[in-house]
């Protein structure tokens, strides 16, 4: 397993801070001709993740002369939102070594600010941090052809990724689609869907007859109950059978039989799509109507439904769908109510549930694991920050990458750059390299080479800003 980016970059900061005078130490004579007015923060222009380097911070007066005897308290910040910074420092004799950890490859700066007088501040020049090949992190890749959030991204048998639908910054629901090619890192347009769709499902039909193998089933996200199939052999969408119920923010799960279970989406109804006939048929109802829930295929072929909400109230309940009987039955409840959360099947057959909006309308930092053997949920160590409407992706080494999400209430309605890794062996989350761009309602798709493609999402809600950028977790 690679070393998490959170352990990446150690910066030794040696601070030459001096001024004179009494009180806060920000005024008086000493070696300068007046009190300190700003800091000069000098840093190298380039660095490699994991390679230590030094910066110099000097307290200067308005004539840019060093102010000796400075005794104020300095607060350090960084443009790297995931940086691990030292506590506020009182610098004895104007000089002290400071250790800082930057987590994110890319361009970062470090800022020194006097606590008592915040106008006394200084920012380093940009530090271009290259990714260490032995470390995890995100890197930008080609942008999509247009903005998308609440869309889908589906790995195809040929290794490309079908990105479809969603909404843009103007509130337009989209019918357009495009393909990401990992070999070139670029997106190209493909045929458009018959209907525009948002918060819908896209399911690769991998186990059906030859006529449907490799096709992708698109269901829901419209005012009516339509469905269509994408054929990667010719890049076109064609209509298929009519679903029993319209669905929005529902789930779709490929079963071992090759059929697809569609459940929830502002309803308690459920139905099955049969690729052999192209028809939908009703199956047993869920115990509770729910949307923004999760559906996870378990090792025994049953499907675990967790959480969700109805009438703006999040649930902690869970239920199991048995394909052999076509019925849903209650199982153990989660330790916390959740909607807009994630559920990821682990290699040990258990299910990791993370984040979401809880019953207090807060973004949750908690996580728990469902054990199919006992039908119960148990808590694990919390995440380092809250995540909702985020992504959680099982990596080749068995860890789970949790990325992005909704930040509330500070600032309200903005995306997060936060990312962390869950290790099932220790049941602990560790920070990893942060996203290059804050986002939620995005997608994460694990590619055949083990990398994870992140596409689109919403950057903020006021004003609405939808993204067309994409990045790769390596």
What are these regions (language model features)?
Residues 1, 34-36, 474:
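N-terminal low-hydrophobic presequence detector
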